[in-house]
Amino acid sequence: MSSQFPSSPYRTVDPYSPPNYKQQPNCPSSNYEKAGKTASESIGNFGKGDYPTPFPSSSIGRVSSPVRSNKVDAIPSSPAFPGQLAETSPKFSSKLSSPSRHTRVINAELDPSKISTITVGRNSSQCDVALCKNKFISRVHASITYLPQTNEVKIHCFSMNGLIVTYRKQFDCYQLKDTMNNNNRAYRLVPRFSNEKCVKEIQDEGGFINFTLEEGDTVYMTYYKGIMLDFRQVLLRISLKEKNSSSEPLRFEKKAEFESESETKHMGSIRKHPLIFTDTSMDRPKKILKDSNKISIGSDSGVAERMLNHFLNSKSSPLSSVSSVDHEEQTLRQDSLSSDKNPMTMKKPKLNKRVLPSKPKKSVKENLDELSRRNIDVMHLQHILTNHLAFANVQQTPLFQLQQVNSQISELSRDELRSILSDAKCVGVIYRHGKDAAGKPLDEEYFYDLENDDDYERRNLVSSLKGGRTGLRSCRRTHKQYFWKKPAK
């Protein structure tokens, strides 16, 4: 590598500086040597003061960008700036622990009138206050209890991730005293100048004081307005509910009761006035629809007579009598109006649909006789079907599979095939109920019965081939339909 691009980050030779005549052997004068020494010393000092160790991504050669010395976050990796590193490190640490970095703050309110407890965590169904979905937050992370007798807050941590309790510095509580409470790790926050021994570390950072709670830890501290719980990326602010909010529903209930009483009094005064009957039949426009006017006039006159008789003969309170009469009048008028709007229509009687007579099913003997008249060897087909059931890989075969044994059997109907199988002594049947996945009824299944087979050669051959699994178990000879059920979590 040439001298113009050195490997060291410090500049040794500048192409724009005056030449060093000390390196030239033909230099006759000593003044030039002194000038070369002073120039090289000034160049070396200038490079050491203004060119720090660059970052790995910087380019080699002459540094063209300005030195970043005023930024707090840029911490150089060279020991050339020890003073600057010592100044920037406290600022950087305070910035990391500041609560302003958290993006979300959740309020948790406690009832000051009684001992109230809320649970905090990730699961909304198990906790009163649900935090965000975060891997550092457990399903039930902590519980917060307010004790109104002593104005204290009890914080208990359930999670192995722990939490950080943050409060303001002006509260003057800097020590945690150990309290033996049922052999659990319980602490109490005490003032700074207390004689108690401090058992847990408390960090003093600027205007806030922090201490951590691990899994199973409990702390008792006096309630202040600025207590916050840090769950990493989420802050929980603890506060008390306002006492005025509980008195507002009572005030609204009293107001509603007063309004209801005034309304009932007003309605009673209205009902005490005498009844005045007016004839309003002339004001209404009349519709001419067959003989509906006669019905409406008769109903109106009957209503008036009934109302007068009921009012004169009743001994009960006028309020109840008037309400019952009004109800009767209303129902009768609705009936008359409905008869006016809906003229009578003749309904056609429902005609019973003609049911086609179904063909009666033939018996087994009739089916076999019909097959013999068609020159079909029933005994041969029985022998083929029995051999298929006896030497099949499965012990039970449905009917639709037996129809596909050969071409001659496939031409038979299902009833004819059932008749052939039912006539064989060594063939058993399992009747099934229900439907398959396509909604079609399930076919019956047939199996080979070794004990009832008269062909001894076939019995010996089947037992020698299949061994002990020749017969069908009795529990499998009845149909059992299984349904899929979603497994429990």
Swiss-Prot record:
PROSITE patterns: FHA_DOMAIN (PS50006). Transmembrane segments: none annotated. CDD domains: FHA_PLM2-like. The modification Phosphoserine is found at residues 40, 100. GO terms for biological process: DNA damage response; regulation of gene expression. SUPFAM superfamilies: SMAD/FHA domain (SSF49879). One of its GO terms (molecular function) is chromatin binding. Residues 118-170 form the FHA domain. It is found in: Nucleus. It holds the Pfam family FHA. GO terms for cellular component: chromatin; cytoplasm; mitochondrion; nucleus; Rpd3L-Expanded complex. Residues 1-101, 316-366 are annotated as: Disordered. Induction: Regulated in a cell cycle-dependent manner, peaking in G1 phase. Appears exclusively during the G1 and S phases (at protein level). Negatively regulated by transcription factor SBF (SWI4-SWI6 cell-cycle box binding factor). InterPro entries: FHA_dom (IPR000253), SMAD_FHA_dom_sf (IPR008984). Residues 89-100 have a biased composition (Low complexity). SMART domains: FHA. It comes from the Eukaryota. Belongs to the PLM2/TOS4 family. Binds to the promoters of genes with functions important for the G1/S (start) transition; primarily genes involved in pheromone response, polarized growth and transcription. This is Protein TOS4. It comes from Saccharomyces cerevisiae (strain ATCC 204508 / S288c) (Baker's yeast). The lineage of its organism: Eukaryota, Fungi, Dikarya, Ascomycota, Saccharomycotina. The gene is TOS4.
